[in-house]
Amino acid sequence: MREIITLQLGQRSNYLATHFWNVQESYFTYSENEASPVDHDISFRPGIGADGSETFTPRTIIYDLKGGFGSLRQYNALYEVEENVGMPKGLWDGNEVIQRQPNIPQSEYQKALELGLPLPRLTPETVRYWSDFNRLFYHPKSIVQLNEYEMNSQLMPFEDWTVGEAFFNSLDREHDLLDRDFRPFAEECDQLRGIQLFTGTDDAWGGFAARYIDRLRDEFGKKIIWTFALESGLKTEREKQFLRAKNSAKSISEISRQSTAYVPISMPPSKLPHYVNLNIASEWYISALTSVAVESVTLPGRLRWYEGIEPWFLDNAGPQRIFALRATIRSENSELPFASHLRPNDSTQMDTDEVDHDEIEQSEQRFDLGFSPIGSATRTNNTHIFSQVQVVRDSKCNSERPERAEVGQGLTSHRLSLMTGYVPSTLSNFRSTLEFPILDSFPSDLIHEQGPAGSTLRVDAALSATSGIGRDLKNLQQTIGRRIALEEREDLINGLHELSHAYQAGWENDSDSGDD
């Protein structure tokens, strides 16, 4: 078994991850004659409930600030225990006065879910917290509330990267967070494959995540770590906008170096196609749209068919670790663009002379949803794709074999670039007939012609490392450099410059980029 442990840091991440886990639960099958195409043991852990019954809960650790969990309790129906809230006798002989904050009431959806009643339709008004549309039970050790900071506090806002960094260091000194929170899940694994991290990166959670990943690298060495770096795509006042940009720049500079794949995501995307009906005032809507792309592009790592294949690794493709996320979404009654170009594949490796460069270009053109604030620069004839993972989910697919295309005559991409100065394109394509399921916890009108709960969406999603990322990193470097304090400037600017250079070496030089 090759398990994955998920880390969820902060409110925005928990909205996205709740959609993700709801979808994973929908893949469960309950008949011996019906096998799920998804290997649930990768992301879920078996256990024993308080009454001795077997449980199966997400292999995840959820961090949020005080007030961020809504009505979700640490001990749920599976693990209900009587808590001894009194102090041990002998320590205090006086009267006890216990002060409790009032509990946040459950949503009508959660009440109906627990009682097995027909579920009411969710709306932006009834989804107050991510727990309001959650469909799963979590192990008590998965719930980690950080009481030192309160959600949406004006007195102690959790907005500055350095605040999150200092907060993690303080907690880690006192509790050793890896030993307390992470190691119990890691020790349950037969063969830990990697770590999937959802985190905010344009606020204090970026600093918290950076130091957490440092600890993970120290303890778990070369394990896969893929980071979904979530940023607010909504406009705000100028000073706060700059703080977000500075936080994002620090996160990119530090976290991407420690990640196998770093995927910056704007929530919501800056541009939306006509078929998306997005309520930008609702984190539930915004995270639902993002979840379609994220759950789809990570799907091959959970499918039984692709067991043993690492879609995140593209032949050791070199130093490009920042990937842009893009997608196209259609209802089950609509065709995906370029669907006619999907062809059956007889082998998992394509010869060099089979690489179709027109098909590479079409691969770029078919996406109409760009989630990444990095790599979103306008494509030019000089844009190069270093590597790309593409996943097509369409019930009409006539093949579920992976397809690999590489320009390089059998040499690894990294070795070829060292020998010739030219960086090849490496493309990995995965196809599955398993479409994205529409659940009753998903907004009912997000996609044009979207069907009711029980229907599906067709999805074409990709992660791409392109030379456009290098250009955007240089733009970010210039923007931050104009206003950042002198004591922070050198390390951050140099870090961004090194990252941007990885997307130019062997393809375009500094003089081509138009920078001084």
Curated annotation (Swiss-Prot):
What's a Pfam family this protein contains? Answer: Misat_Tub_SegII
The role this protein plays is: Involved in the partitioning of the mitochondrial organelle and mitochondrial DNA (mtDNA) inheritance.
Q: What cellular component GO annotations does this protein have?
A: mitochondrion
Whose protein is this, by species? Coccidioides immitis (strain RS)
Instruction: Name the PANTHER family for this protein.
Output: MITOCHONDRIAL DISTRIBUTION REGULATOR MISATO, PROTEIN MISATO HOMOLOG 1
Note the InterPro entries from the entry: DML1/Misato, DML1/Misato_tubulin, Misato_II_tubulin-like, Tubulin/FtsZ_GTPase_sf
GO biological process entries: mitochondrion organization
Q: Which UniProt keywords apply?
A: Mitochondrion
Record's SUPFAM superfamilies? Tubulin nucleotide-binding domain-like
Entry's localization field:
Mitochondrion
The opening ranks of the lineage are: Eukaryota, Fungi, Dikarya, Ascomycota, Pezizomycotina
What is the similarity comment for this entry?
Belongs to the misato family.
Source organism superkingdom = Eukaryota
Q: Which gene encodes it?
A: DML1
Official protein name in the record: Protein DML1
Predominant localisation class: mitochondrion
